[in-house]
Amino acid sequence: MAAKETKELPPFEYPQGYHCIAGVDEVGRGPLVGDVVTAAVILDPNNPIEGLNDSKKLSEKKRLALLPEIQEKALAWAVGRCSPEEIDQLNILQATMVAMQRAVEGLAVKPDLVLIDGNRCPALPMDSQAVVKGDLRVAQISAASIIAKVVRDQEMEELDKQYPQFGFAQHKGYPTKAHFDAIEKHGVIEQHRKSFKPVKKALGIEE
């Protein structure tokens, strides 16, 4: 029992003095194809949402059920993204930061504090704080995680309809054996990230 307790994350203590807090998370840093997608969410403290958790720990059915509830009950939400071309120009870390900035800029309500999942924050015009494992500890980040995950998954399913031979609906563009095999057999498509090593290799681009 004691061993289990040591693994539990400490509860997040919200900084004092802020009235409007946004949570931000990203999905799609690892895939070889498509946009990196981020979301920013400001929840309504008077209208709580049950069952928020890190999107990766929820079933697809649960994520799809929570999405409209988050969109309806949140005070504001927005999606930001960077394209494969931008990822190739900037690198994936910088592109993720830009996508997060775009999500925050898209909020109809301006937060006075932004909580970011992970260990670094993009440059923002308001206070911000990085929260390690924030998608498990901060409701606003959990909600952002769900929106970003559903949006990106749906985009991969649409891409799968255009290019069924790649199996994007199954692996969502991540570097799986099935994806590598498809690249070897069919080459790369416009939406592939040309700066990622497996794609470079397929294109015959030397490091």
From Swiss-Prot:
EC number: 3.1.26.4
Keywords: Cytoplasm, Endonuclease, Hydrolase, Manganese, Metal-binding, Nuclease
Binding site for a divalent metal cation: D25, E26, D117
Record-annotated RNase H type-2 domain positions: 19-207
Disulfides per UniProt: none
Gene3D superfamilies given in the database record: Ribonuclease H-like superfamily/Ribonuclease H
Catalytic activity, as annotated: Endonucleolytic cleavage to 5'-phosphomonoester
Cofactor binding note of this UniProt entry: Manganese or magnesium. Binds 1 divalent metal ion per monomer in the absence of substrate. May bind a second metal ion after substrate binding.
Coiled-coil blocks: none
Domain of life: Bacteria
Gene Ontology annotations of biological process type: DNA replication, removal of RNA primer; mismatch repair
Localization of this protein: Cytoplasm
Any single Pfam family the record assigns to this protein: RNase_HII
Sequence similarity: Belongs to the RNase HII family.
Record's function text: Endonuclease that specifically degrades the RNA of RNA-DNA hybrids.
Protein name as catalogued: Ribonuclease HII
Species of the source: Vibrio vulnificus (strain YJ016)
